[in-house]
Amino acid sequence: MSRLQLITLDLDNTLWDVEKTIRAAERDLIAWLKTHAEPAHQIYVSNDLATLREQTLQQQPNLRHDLSQLRIEILSGVMRKAQYQEHEARNLAEAAFEVFFAGRNRVAFFPGALEMLQALSERYPVYALTNGNADTSRTGISPYLKGAISSALVGASKPDPSMFHAALNQAGVSAQHCVHIGDHLHDDIRGADAVGMHSIWVNLQQSALSDGDPRPTQEVTQLSDIDAAVTAIENSLTA
């Protein structure tokens, strides 16, 4: 049996540029609102999204980790402010969200991402472990995955240990036999380290580590190097 028994993998900014993806999805959403709900469009574009988000979370703090439902509630609130009745407001919000969500899952993979997923999935069970709301089927990565853990499912976000434990428990694997791969030093690397996982820092920007930063087990600056980094960790383990 392989000494390494599980790979957990961050998605946003590890496999694709999430900021670029969200900007494109927002443009699609705004165009849809302008055509299908002009009064709501005026309210949406004249307000800061972060402000709308915080206003919604003040009323429904339980949505903090469920980004899809949070956005639906934000859009529902905008529709109500535009004087749509509750039923129509909800229907329009859900239709608007679907436009946004289609764009949110229209990702442009970083070079080597799919090849890396293919290589890892042939050797190990791979679980997505994400604070975001990307749909693994709609992004096209589900064939490479044995499971997917999201913050909405757990009710917490990385680096909360419950996120990592959810993957370990679902896979039936202990932390010392797992590698977590991600781009975020705090959410991914520190979080993995706290529960005893090995880690690979995806440092595509080639950033320098500061004194207070966590130290990953391995570091890569391109996704094509991940397979070798995983092998190095595997070889370092005792049976």
What is the predicted function of each stretch?
Residues M1-I7, E19, T35, H87-A89, ...:
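Asp-based, Mg2+/Mn2+-dependent phosphohydrolase catalytic module
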Residues S2-P111:
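N-terminal helical cap/lid subdomain that shapes the substrate entry/recognition surface
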